[in-house]
Amino acid sequence: MYKTSKYTPTDKMSYLICDNYTLLQVMSRFDLSLGFGDKTVQEVCRENGVDCRTFLAVVNFMIEDSDRMEDDVKDISMPSLMNYLKQAHHYFLDFCLPTIRRKLIEAIDCSTENEVAFLILKFFDQYAGEVRKHMDYEDMNVFTYVCLLYTSPSPRDMR
């Protein structure tokens, strides 16, 4: 059963996973491994050098039926969030897309000269290439730029 209210630092990490096992992917992207026993979210994050507020902002965003995180934005660690997003890209590019391609090959008949099957595979490969290009651009440019903005002094501070 999925929790309907927000998780807090004092919630047990095991309860979080029992409530919603899909949050295991979020944990993985923050480099949090299993084996936390009865520890709270805050304890697990602290022991692994993960910003707890950022972790919870992402977790609570994932479980809500909303596409807004306005309440949590002021509390997140930008470097932690950028690392999470890079890990999400890595998972999608290096696991999801190859898995989809493999299943696509299994589903279509590639054993004969089937032009439609070839075109489907060609279209998917072009799509995957565009997705990779987009995510690589974000990883190399957008996330780097955001981190630079985050660490640079604001114009107000330079007076």
Positions of the model-derived regions?
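Short, contiguous alpha-helical
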Residues: 124-148
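Ordered, amphipathic secondary-structure segments that act as subunit-interaction surfaces
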Residues: 80-104
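N-terminal alpha-helical targeting/anchoring segments
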Residues: 17, 24, 31-46, 52
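Short, structural beta-strand-to-alpha-helix junction motif
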Residues: 8-13, 22, 39-42, 77
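Hydrophobic/aromatic-rich structural module bridging two neighboring secondary-structure elements via a short loop
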Residues: 60-89
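Single conserved hydrophobic/aromatic residue that forms the stacking wall/gate
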Residues: 150-159
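Hydrophobic, well-structured mid-protein blocks that either form specific transmembrane helices
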Residues: 95-131
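Metal- and O2-centered redox machinery and metal/ROS homeostasis
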Residues: 1-10, 20-24, 28
